[in-house]
Amino acid sequence: DASPELPGALDFARYLKSKGIVGAVSHTEAEYDGIKEAYEAGFTHAAHFYNAMPGFHKRREYKYEGTVESVYLTDGMTIELIADGIHLPSTILKLAYKLKGVEHTCLVTDALSYAAAEGKAIDDPRIIIEDGVCKLADRSALAGSIATMDQLVRTMVKADIPLADAIRMAS
């Protein structure tokens, strides 16, 4: 995955596409034209959707679409949700399901090697496990998840997503 606005990213997308590899946008601030160009080049997936991707924003007095809205508007682009209930709240999970549907949505744990390690000691001073998630030690940002896929399915069901659809998105 790559930020499509970075130098060489679109060439990378075209290369992946030529090899039959699914390319993904991530950690990007691309707006609609950038996402459209990225999709056409071969980035057909949005990894860790909503994470390090802005929604609509203002520049001076004008509003602009963000990466999130641009991905929603790109028919055929699939999304990946970290549905641990921490990275994304249930309202966002419902919105993504409603707009992209089961066919264009998949679940990802984003789990570090500390999956299911709540309450256990870890050997990396750069991160802590707290509140059911990995955080940077200074608590300035999330560093990953400790959720397992079954937890993601349960989180989706708690968000009123049908069990069959939650399982399909997880597989």
Residue locations for each model-derived region?
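Active-site core of metal-dependent hydrolases
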Residues: 1-117
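His/Asp/Glu-enriched, well-ordered alpha-helical/loop segment
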Residues: 63-81, 97-109, 114-171
